[in-house]
């Protein structure tokens, strides 16, 4: 049996799985082949259960492919693989992947769980106790982000450091930041967890410079157990703040202290931020949060209504969720308005009542046919992610919806072909033109494509 068995499995899994899933769940595994048994070691119980639940069939299938009649037994354990023993063959996870350009030095402080408190500094946590994992509504759009955040809360300073969450406004990034903070402090009551908006870091640094207290500023930020910074894109063009955060970032990572960052865009797409910082943002795990799909939007509304002791009929929740697709904050704001109107008037919450209470918001939504809106609608219709439409993937399950979205953008907006191409991952105008012609051809040849196009036009224009 080849000593490279696990490397072969890894190579195939890397091809078959989305990059985020592979990095998050498969790459942390260690493997050891001994006495016809392949032992896979997960860093914690959470990862072990997830891999066994989601990827066991994939792994068993690959073992059958590679080993034929000599398939080894598969065993899962929590922890690290033991030191190399006689007659055993260690198997490492060395598949081709980007490697961080520096080697981290050994930690210069005790491990996270054993780090002593430093009472001479006063830490302002700012973590909102109301935002927890329990009241975060999970769906396909945020499942990976929630799972990564949960693991960081259980094992801060571990494999996913830094954790970088990105996505549009109002999708739950801030909620997850607070949930991680609450999770860490639940495990260790005196944990030094600091949450802040990136602008607060800038303000603190400016104040420290003005008061000749920069050393105290450095000591404060470099001695926390976990630093949670929201909207890191606001560091753009603030060179001195970036310089200081660069050194803070390095110090925290070397000390095994957890860093979690959020942004409205992928790290490499943040303009005005130094390349060395953007590179470091991707050293751990980067996860996108997509706009919630219909089922998740309905669940969010029902949970919010339940928290307010309001009976929300399912058909009303569906009516609201179907018309407000952009983000969680907009959904919750709309529901708050409906609840307030119901309380003021004493009327029952029905679809007709919601039409009246939200008439201006619904009218505005009906006028908003933008490329972003088209992308979200098409992604939801074909049950893929917006990120897939913007990616370089060429499989038919992604390429055809991408062509459909481009054709709809040309049909329903005033954007030029180059502008549409730019909105779809920087493609050129000839790609957009080809997509439009292809969909036009398929609408004549395929009843399904013709129906899809009509349904999407109706949804976007209604």
UniProtKB/Swiss-Prot annotation:
Which keywords fit this entry according to its UniProt record? ATP-binding, Cytoplasm, DNA replication, DNA-binding, Lipid-binding, Nucleotide-binding
Q: Name one GO molecular function term.
A: ATP hydrolysis activity
Q: Which GO terms describe its cellular component?
A: cytoplasm; plasma membrane
Membrane-spanning regions, if any? none
Renumbered to this chain, region (Domain IV, binds dsDNA) spans 343-462
Q: Where is this region: Domain II?
A: 83-125
The record, for InterPro entries, names: AAA+_ATPase (IPR003593), Chromosome_initiator_DnaA (IPR001957), Chromosome_initiator_DnaA-like (IPR020591), Chromosome_initiator_DnaA_CS (IPR018312), DnaA_C (IPR013159), DnaA_dom (IPR013317), DnaA_N_dom (IPR024633), DnaA_N_sf (IPR038454)
The segment annotated Domain I, interacts with DnaA modulators runs over 1-83
Protein residues bound to ATP: 170, 172-174
Q: Where in the cell is it found?
A: Cytoplasm
* Alphabetized NCBIfam families for the sequence: DnaA (TIGR00362)
Q: How does it assemble?
A: Oligomerizes as a right-handed, spiral filament on DNA at oriC.
Q: Write down what this protein is called.
A: Chromosomal replication initiator protein DnaA
In its UniProt entry, the species of origin is given as Yersinia enterocolitica serotype O:8 / biotype 1B (strain NCTC 13174 / 8081)
Recorded name of the encoding gene: dnaA
């Amino acid at each position: 049996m080849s000593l490279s068995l696990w490397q072969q499995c890894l190579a195939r899994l890397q091809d078959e799985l989305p990059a985020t899933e592979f990095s998050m769940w498969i790459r942390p595994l260690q493997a050891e082949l001994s006495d016809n048994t392949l032992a896979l070691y997960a860093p914690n119980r959470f990862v072990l259960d997830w891999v066994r639940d989601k990827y066991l069939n994939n792994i068993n299938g690959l073992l059958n492919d590679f080993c034929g009649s000599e398939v080894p037994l598969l065993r899962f354990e929590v922890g690290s693989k033991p030191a190399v023993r006689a007659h055993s063959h260690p198997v490492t996870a060395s598949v081709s992947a980007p490697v961080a350009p520096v080697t981290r030095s050994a930690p210069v402080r005790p491990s996270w769980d054993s780090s002593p408190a430093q009472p001479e500094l006063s830490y302002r946590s700012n973590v909102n106790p109301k935002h927890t994992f329990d009241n975060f509504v999970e769906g396909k759009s945020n499942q990976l982000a929630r799972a990564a955040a949960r693991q960081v809360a259980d094992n801060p300073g571990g494999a996913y450091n830094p954790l970088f969450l990105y996505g549009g406004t109002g999708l739950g990034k801030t909620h997850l930041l607070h949930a991680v903070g609450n999770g860490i402090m639940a495990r260790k009551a005196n944990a030094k967890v600091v949450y802040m908006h990136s602008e607060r870091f800038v303000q603190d640094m400016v104040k420290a410079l003005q008061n000749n207290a920069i050393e105290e500023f450095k000591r404060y930020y470099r001695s926390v157990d976990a630093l949670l910074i929201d909207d890191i894109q606001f560091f753009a063009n603030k060179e001195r703040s970036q310089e200081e955060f660069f050194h803070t970032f390095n110090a925290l990572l070397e000390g095994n202290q957890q860093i979690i960052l959020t942004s409205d865009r992928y790290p490499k797409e943040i303009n005005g931020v130094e390349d060395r910082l953007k590179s470091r943002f991707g050293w751990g795990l980067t996860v996108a949060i997509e706009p919630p799909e219909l089922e998740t939007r309905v669940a969010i509304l029902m949970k919010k209504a339940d928290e307010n002791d309001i009976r929300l009929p399912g058909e009303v929740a569906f009516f609201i969720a179907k018309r407000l697709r952009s983000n969680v904050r907009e959904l919750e704001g709309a529901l708050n308005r409906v609840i307030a109107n119901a309380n003021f008037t004493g009327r029952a919450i029905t679809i007709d009542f919601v039409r009246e209470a939200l008439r201006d918001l619904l009218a505005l939504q009906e006028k908003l046919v933008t490329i972003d809106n088209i992308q979200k609608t098409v992604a939801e219709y074909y049950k893929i992610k917006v990120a897939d439409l913007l990616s370089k993937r060429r499989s038919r399950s992604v390429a055809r919806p991408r062509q459909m979205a481009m054709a709809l953008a040309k049909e329903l907006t005033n954007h030029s072909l180059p502008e549409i191409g730019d909105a779809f991952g920087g493609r050129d105008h000839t790609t957009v033109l080809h997509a439009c012609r292809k969909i036009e051809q398929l609408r004549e040849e395929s009843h399904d494509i013709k129906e899809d196009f009509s349904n999407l036009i109706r949804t976007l224009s209604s």
